Amino acid sequence: MPNWRDQYLSGIKDAELNNPVNMELVQTCSQMADRISALEAEKNGLETLVTTNGKTTARPTEPSTNDPAVAQLKQDLAEALRSKGVAEKRLRSSEEELLQLRSKHKTNTRSIRDLTADKNSLTTRLKDREYELREKRKFIEQVQDEMIALNLQMSMAEKERDKVKKENKELVDRWMKRMAQEAEAMNLANEPIFKKGR
């Protein structure tokens, strides 16, 4: 059955594979776990050695507290445990920060998706508006061209009307002059008859 260090190390590796947080932190934890394992193995070996060598003494099960190796081992173990606590604290802090960043990432992703949809909608509306404006410009240009053509036609019609009016007036004037001449000629021709009748 794996001990707590192996489980802890395996859990860190699994977490790192599934959710990479901070490789440096994971490596530090792994190194500390290895160091703790080595120190505890060394401690067990020293305790066994002290127990074996001290069977003839009055305290066979307790290693000598004055042994510098044991003291150093305890100091190293305490330092390793302290470093482990610091690393675990940093790991928890990193995991919390990761959760916050993931939550923020989801929010940002949703915002980006919404903004992209708004942008696409506005782009479509803008294209429709540009198309509408182009068509209106074409229509205005057509109307202006038609107005110019109508003005030209009207100007030509007015000139034609003035010409016809002038020709009619000249024709009427000639006809009136002719009628007057014919009337005068008739009067002159009938004047001897009028004189005889008197």
Swiss-Prot record:
Cellular component GO terms held in the UniProt record: phagophore assembly site membrane
Coiled-coil regions listed in the entry: 24-177
Membrane topology: Peripheral membrane protein
Top-rank taxon, per record: Eukaryota
One of the GO BP terms on file: protein transport
Disrupted gene: phenotype observed: Does not significantly decrease the growth rate under nutrient-rich conditions. Strongly reduces conidiation. Causes only mild infection in point-inoculated spikelets of flowering wheat heads and impairs the spreading to nearby spikelets. Also reduces strongly the production of deoxynivalenol (DON), an important virulence determinant.
Keywords: Autophagy, Coiled coil, Membrane, Protein transport, Transport
Keyword Protein transport (UniProt): yes
Location(s) in or outside the cell: Preautophagosomal structure membrane
Region forming the signal peptide: none
Main location: membrane
Assembly and oligomerization: Homodimer. Part of the ATG5-ATG12/ATG16 complex. Several units of each may be present in this complex. Interacts directly with ATG12.
Protein task: Stabilizes the ATG5-ATG12 conjugate. The ATG5-ATG12/ATG16 complex is required for efficient promotion of ATG8-conjugation to phosphatidylethanolamine and ATG8 localization to the pre-autophagosomal structure (PAS). Also recruits ATG3 to the PAS. Involved in endoplasmic reticulum-specific autophagic process and is essential for the survival of cells subjected to severe ER stress. Autophagy is required for proper vegetative growth, asexual/sexual reproduction, and full virulence. Autophagy is particularly involved in the biosynthesis of deoxynivalenol (DON), an important virulence determinant.
Record family assignment: Belongs to the ATG16 family.
Protein name: Autophagy-related protein 16
Organism: Gibberella zeae (strain ATCC MYA-4620 / CBS 123657 / FGSC 9075 / NRRL 31084 / PH-1) (Wheat head blight fungus)
Origin organism lineage: Eukaryota, Fungi, Dikarya, Ascomycota, Pezizomycotina
